[in-house]
Each structure stands twice: as C-alpha cells, then as structure tokens.
Amino acid sequence: MSSQQRSKKKNNSRLYILIAAALLLVVMIVLIAVKCSGGKKNPNTDSTSGEASSQPLEAADIDPLTGLSGFKAQGKRPIAVVINNSNPARPQWGLCTPDIVVEGVTEAGITRMLWLYSDINKIPDKVGSLRSARHDFVEIAEGLDAIFVHWGGSKYAYSAISDRGVDDLDGRSYMGRYFFRDKERTNVAIEHRGYTTREAIDKGLTKLDIRRDIKSGYQKPFAFVSESSPRTPSGGACSNIDIVFSSYCNHSFTYSAQDGLYLNNINGAPMTDADGKQMAVKNVIILYCPVSLMGDSSGCVDMDLTGGSGVYLSNGAYENITWKKGGPHDMLKLYSSDGSELKLNPGKSYIGIVPSEKEARTVIA
C-alpha cells in the first residue's frame, strides 16, 4: 500500500470517528430531553388531548337551579320557602317567581309546595301564603343546603330541624318582625294569609347570623345542556300530562309551542298568581314515591324519598327517568333511563312528588 493510500485511509477513519461521535452526542441529547420531560407527549400534538381540550367548560355564571347564564350569586345558599296550596290559599303571591317549585302531599291529600330560589334577590316583595313545615320538605331543603323558611311545623318537622341542625327562619317565632298577615284577604281564615318579603328574609338571616355561603364540597344539584343546544326528551311527543296527587288535588301541564313552556292547570283551571299570571315552566319532572301515614293522630304522612321512577317533560316531549335521594342529608339526583345523569333544558322547573299508588292515573298525550 502506498503512502498516499495509507494517508487517505487514515483520514477516512478520522471522519468515521467524528460522525460516530456526533451521532452519539445527538442520541444523548434526545435521551436527556425525554428524561427531563418525564417521557410525556406534547399535549399540543396529542390528538386525544386536543379533543379533550376542545370540550367547553361550564361558565362561571350558570345558575345552579335553572342552568341559565348571568347568575350573580355564585357560592350562596339557596332559599326554600314552604307554601300553602289549599283552596283558600290560592292565588298565591309570587307563584311565578321560584326557580323550582316542588309539590307533595300532606294530611288528607292536601298538597304543599316548596319554592326554591338560587338567589335571595329573586324573592319578590311579597311571597305566600306561607305554611307550616313537614319533615319531607325539610329533607329536600337540607339536601340542597338551602335556608328553610316556614311558618310553624309538625312535630316531625321540628324534630328534623332541631336534630340535624337545619338553618331555618320560622314565622311562629318572628311574626310581626319578618312574617306578616295580609289585611285584605279577610274572606279566608288567618292561617291562609301569612306572607313574608325579600327584605324581611334578608333581615332575619342577618339578625340570626345564619350562614349564607354554601358548605364546603357542595355540588350543583342538576345537570343542564347549554342554552344554545336545547334537547328533546327521547320518549315521544307530549303536549299534555295529567297527574293526580289525591282526590283533593290534580294538575295538568299543557305545552305552549309558542313560548316552549308548559302551562300549569290545577283542578281544571289555570293556576295563576295573585296578579293573574299563569304559572309556566320549561321542565316538568314527576317523581313517584311510596307515601304512608306516620301512624298517629296527627294525620302526617311520610314520603319515602329513597328513590324511584319518574317522567321528564320538556320542549313538547317526554322520557322515563329514575331518581335517587337516599338519606336526609343527600341531594336529590335525576337520571336518564341509561343510568347517566339527566340533563335538563335551562329554565324554571316543576317537580311533583306523586304517590306511587297514583302513578297509573298519569296520562301523557
């Protein structure tokens, strides 16, 4: 081999060494970079992460009871007001103002209502007529961490309030200060004339130093679709539903396609407030549950609020649902037939807790 060939071979060897060293350096840099990043993929290039990040987050101003935007009282406790629904108490003051109206039977088949407000500022200048508490309504309010407003109560209701430390404002204790008797409805008994006001409730909560912020770990009670993406229940069309609580009280809700709401009729006549406005809601929710007597001379009933079946109506259609509450502290939850949490259309709701024995008398048309 000539000296020229030996020199060329030597130069080639040096070149190979340099190339190998460079490649080794690149590999080391890559390994160090991966180690420092924890071996995680770049979320900006991961298609799965990209899909997840594109999911819209719930806006901070969504009302927990209606699902409507523009809510200004985030973090505040709802207010639950017990309302009289016997014949002499109608028409009620403020009937069309609650976010949710819950109705259930009491003694002798008479129904009582629980009006739920997500914000104290939604309560009108006059709300009533107020009535005494029943333990089932205490449990519903308790599950929502709501402040409970009532005028008197059964012994079972007072036991529930006392034993479980439910925050309440009671007209029996504060008549003339935060609770009043209407002076114009002189044609009905005095127990049908009780009312309160937004200002009076506000003053009462301040005087009694009642907690106004929701408790730690609080979860919103209901799921809603967005206002821009309304849903139609999957069970079929429903322009009207008839429900029966007892021989004393029955309702029908008739769908108005013009405004997308269900109009409430009670005992064959429009259910209107003191100003003549008919109650109308976006969502009608019927829950069936066993109802039994407490077994004493009081005539009080007990609604088994463990859970059961029901019907959901909205946008002119219906579907079968299930529901669950469980214990007194537990929140009422609604589920679709497939077991997923029921998603409501944003708007006001009516929840009727109907005795199971009356389920067969429900008529959907």
Each model region followed by its residue ranges:
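N-terminal Lys/Arg-rich, disordered targeting/topogenic segments
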Residues: 1-15
